[in-house]
Amino acid sequence: MPKSTNSVASKARRKRILNKAKGYWGSRGNVLTVVKHAVDKAEQYAYRDRRVKKRTFRSLWIMRINAAARQNGVSYSRLMDAIHKKNIEIDRKALAEIAVKDPEAFAMIVKSALD
């Protein structure tokens, strides 16, 4: 009896892996054994960096709030302390957006937090 192989599934599996490596340079994009390692590593980086992205954006928002707060004569830590003590419900993302897009409104928030 001849050896039977499920070539349809094998080709589909290889094609799926090769499609994930589209745009990779050299053998990383067309040699299956190298592609497997490249795709695995890319997925590891993607998994890790989805978590790092949250930290990166939070630090960006803090930098923007700090810069705008210092233009209004107060440090970031004192501003956030005042906002929490006054129970002003605004998150850092929204506060950073206001600081960049509407400095007058940000100045009003600073004034109301410090008064």
Curated annotation (Swiss-Prot):
InterPro entries: Ribosomal_bL20, RIBOSOMAL_L20_CS, Ribosomal_protein_bL20_C. Keywords: Ribonucleoprotein, Ribosomal protein, RNA-binding, rRNA-binding. One of its GO terms (molecular function) is rRNA binding. GO terms for biological process: ribosomal large subunit assembly; translation. SUPFAM superfamilies: Ribosomal protein L20. It holds the Pfam family Ribosomal_L20. PROSITE patterns: RIBOSOMAL_L20. GO terms for cellular component: ribonucleoprotein complex; ribosome. The keyword rRNA-binding applies. It comes from the Bacteria. Belongs to the bacterial ribosomal protein bL20 family. Binds directly to 23S ribosomal RNA and is necessary for the in vitro assembly process of the 50S ribosomal subunit. It is not involved in the protein synthesizing functions of that subunit. This is Large ribosomal subunit protein bL20. It comes from Chlorobaculum parvum (strain DSM 263 / NCIMB 8327) (Chlorobium vibrioforme subsp. thiosulfatophilum). The lineage of its organism: Bacteria, Pseudomonadati, Chlorobiota, Chlorobiia, Chlorobiales.
